[in-house]
A protein has these predicted regions:
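Iron-sulfur cluster-binding electron-transfer modules in prokaryotic oxidoreductases
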Residues: 1-25, 200-480
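Short strand-turn-strand beta-turns centered on an Asx-Gly dipeptide
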Residues: 24, 63-66
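Short, structural beta-strand-to-alpha-helix junction motif
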Residues: 28-34, 75, 242
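Ferredoxin-type iron-sulfur electron-transfer modules in oxidoreductases and energy-metabolism complexes
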Residues: 29-41, 86, 90-233, 315, ...
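Active-site phosphate-binding and catalytic loops of NTP-dependent enzymes
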Residues: 43-49
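Short cysteine clusters
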Residues: 52, 57-60, 72, 132-138, ...
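Extracellular beta-sheet/turn segments enriched in Thr/Pro/Gly and aliphatic residues
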Residues: 80-84
Length: 480
């Protein structure tokens, strides 16, 4: 088996470099077995950490083909590229975890006479946050770390763990705010790379933000947003006649009816960028789909949940569920990644919720004509990790793009209330994404999120198209 390992000795090297090694290992060998073989048979100077060899200590975390993994658990493949985590480097695959550890709080019981009794219910609530093995893969992958003062997912997870512990006497909410609580974009990359799949955004970040809101510690922009939603039922002020004002309650398809669905438009596509939603209706009509649009639908509540203003959520949920139940639909389509993720994960709906790309890829769609240009696709975090949808939009895009150049996923910085609350941080995160876009050589970016569309246009200067709008271009070209 051949592997490529990133090497760096600060005493002799001016910069890191890659070296290729060929070793003999058993079938099913782990990356750690390969590193051992290189160390024991080829180069004893190779530096790497390990201890338990059972996925419990976290010390052997490295990057394999660009993604964090525990070397003792990741099966080795021929051609693997092994690098250190994206943390300050000491030597070879060894990184400095001291700064990350320094950000973590520890139990503060005060006087032993003040200690509270821990109940079984307390333990159950804390348990998911105790699974952390401190591998720091999450910090290595977090887009907000380095772009702000954010202490990172591990530190915030620990803040909530201690906040839930009745024995702890410190003010963990105020500490969390000081450690950059509102800098998290809730992209869920930390969950994706966590060996224990700890839901830090939902079980720590959003919980602490809700407590911060009750304490008056939220960001001014988030307060204004919450007030707007409570007073109007919408998270954005209208710039033109809204989508719901322009369309009829039922949009009949061209030809045979293949399916009947409800459509949840979301605030951005309703009042700020209406045309992509209108384009989506034309695409659905073209593909034999009857669309029912309840006019009583309101904001899904995603901006409130992500920023901690959860008090108004039950009313929004009730109004939206009732709107579609009364419409008598079994499936509700969304075209905003954030709305779709919220309806799927934060609601308990009696109907199915599906993204428009998910639905079209599932039932089949008419092939459009190819549209000129080179296109790349940006995965919205709330679609990729919030709904586990990745291939479906690419299927649609490849059907219409003259040339498609793929791009690895990375948060653009617009989510989690960061774009509205801390725009400077959002711009820094976006600048990294902009460089990735530049490397593709694409003329256009395509995505399925209005917030990503706005932000990517700002940081790249490129035209950003919604997949529905691009497909409609292809259909119109086909009809010429």
């Amino acid at each position: 088996m051949k592997v490529v390992i990133s090497r760096f000795n600060p005493e002799t090297d001016s910069e890191p470099h890659f070296e290729t090694y060929e070793v003999s290992v058993s079938e099913g060998a782990r990356v750690l077995n390969v590193l051992d073989a290189v160390h024991d048979t080829i180069d004893a100077s190779l530096g790497y950490r390990h201890c338990c060899r059972g996925g419990q200590c976290g010390s052997c975390a490295v990057r394999v083909n660009g993604e964090p993994a525990l070397a003792c658990m990741q099966e080795a493949k021929d051609g693997d590229i092994i690098e250190p985590l994206s943390l300050p480097r000491i030597r070879d695959l060894i990184v400095d975890i001291a700064p990350a550890i320094a950000q973590m709080a520890w139990l503060n019981t005060g006087s032993c006479f003040e200690c509270s009794h821990v109940t079984a219910d307390d333990i159950e609530e804390i348990k998911p946050l105790r699974e952390c093995i401190e591998c720091f893969s999450c910090i290595s992958s977090c887009p907000a770390v380095g772009a702000s003062t954010y202490a990172g997912p591990t530190a915030i997870r620990q803040q909530q763990r201690l906040n839930l512990d009745p024995r702890d006497k410190a003010d963990r909410v105020e500490e969390a705010v000081a450690k950059g609580l509102f800098s998290c974009t809730t992209c869920h990359k930390c969950v994706e790379v966590c060996p224990k799949s700890i839901e830090t955004p939902r079980k720590a970040v959003e919980k602490l933000r809700a407590l911060a809101v009750k304490r008056g510690l939220s960001l001014p922009a988030h307060k204004s947003l919450a007030s707007l939603i409570e007073s109007t039922g919408r998270s954005v002020e209208r710039k033109e006649p809204t989508f719901l004002e322009r369309v009829s309650d039922v949009i009949e398809p061209e030809g045979e009816v293949r399916a009947t669905v409800g459509f949840f438009v979301g605030c951005m596509f309703n009042g700020r960028v209406v045309q992509p939603a209108l384009d989506a209706m034309e695409v659905l009509k073209r593909n034999g789909i009857r669309v029912i649009i309840p006019k009583s639908q309101v904001c899904c509540g995603s901006p409130l949940i992500r920023t901690g203003f959860t008090g108004f959520i039950p009313e929004l949920q009730e109004r939206n569920v009732k709107a579609f139940v009364d419409a008598g639909v079994d499936t509700v389509l969304t075209m905003c990644a954030g709305c779709g993720s919220t309806l799927k994960n934060d609601y308990n709906t009696p109907f199915r919720v599906a993204d428009i790309t998910e639905f079209l890829a599932e039932i089949g769609f008419e092939e459009p004509a190819k549209v000129e240009g080179t296109y790349t696709y940006h995965d919205p975090c709330h679609l990729l990790r919030g709904q586990h949808i990745s291939e479906q939009p690419r299927v649609l895009l490849k059907s219409v793009a003259e040339k498609f150049v793929d791009m690895s996923p990375r948060c653009c910085g617009a989510g989690g209330g960061v774009k509205s609350g801390q725009p400077e941080e959002a711009a820094l995160i976006g600048a990294v994404r902009a460089e990735m876009v530049k490397e593709t050589g694409a003329d256009y970016i395509v995505t399925v999120c209005p917030f990503c569309e706005f932000h990517l246009h700002q940081v790249t200067g490129l035209t950003v198209k919604n997949i529905a709008s691009l497909m409609l271009e292809g259909y119109r070209k086909k009809d010429c």
